[in-house]
Amino acid sequence: MERLKKLVVAGLVLLIGLFALTSCSKAIRTQSSSRTSETTQISRGPLEVTKITYLVYCGGLNKVEMYVFTPDLKVEKYSIYPEGDKTYDYLAGELPSDDLYDITEFEISDLEWSSMVNVLTRVNFMELEEDMSTKDIVDDGASYFIMVETSNAVNISGGYVAGYDDDPDSRRFAEAREMIENAINNR
């Protein structure tokens, strides 16, 4: 009888030990895989942005504002007053005659540039769809477009009242737009 008790106790100790080892092993694997995914995200690093163009068609006004940001921290602001119904592909660099726009230049800080690049990276801007126009009916709203050029890709996203809907993509666009507007307004 004494021997049977010792066998039962030894079996229980063995069973508890195996259970503890299995739990530890799962915890180590989970911790290791979360470190791996963190490393993957970190190693992706910020986008290698070569130019950011922010375009605003001012709602209800015959005015377009375009800002061109470059890594040398220079910004060119184009205040464009287009004539009549004529349209231009501003993002492709097409502009009306010189007398229909003004250019001003200013600089942003290195922190503002890196903040814009970090936000564009974090919101995965290069994966946003091109048309981000609002689904709601809004009178005289502005249209917002962002074009990001990297060392190996270009993505344009935006539209009528873009970034004001409540879906995840609109929130991602809004976050990028707000960071760019902060850099513009902080000068």
Regions found by a protein language model. Give the residues of each.
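Short, well-ordered, aromatic-rich surface patches in folded extracellular/luminal domains
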Residues: 26-61, 126-187
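C-terminal motif of bacterial Sec signal peptides marking the signal peptidase cleavage site
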Residues: 20-23
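Acidic/histidine-rich, surface-exposed loop or edge segments in extracytoplasmic proteins
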Residues: 81, 85-103, 159
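A short, structured loop/turn motif at beta-sheet edges
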Residues: 72, 107-114, 148-154
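Alpha-helical transmembrane segments
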Residues: 11-18
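Bacterial N-terminal signal peptides that target proteins for export
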Residues: 2-11
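Short, flexible N-terminal segments of the mature chain
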Residues: 65-85
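Short, internal acidic amphipathic alpha-helical interface segments
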Residues: 104, 108-141
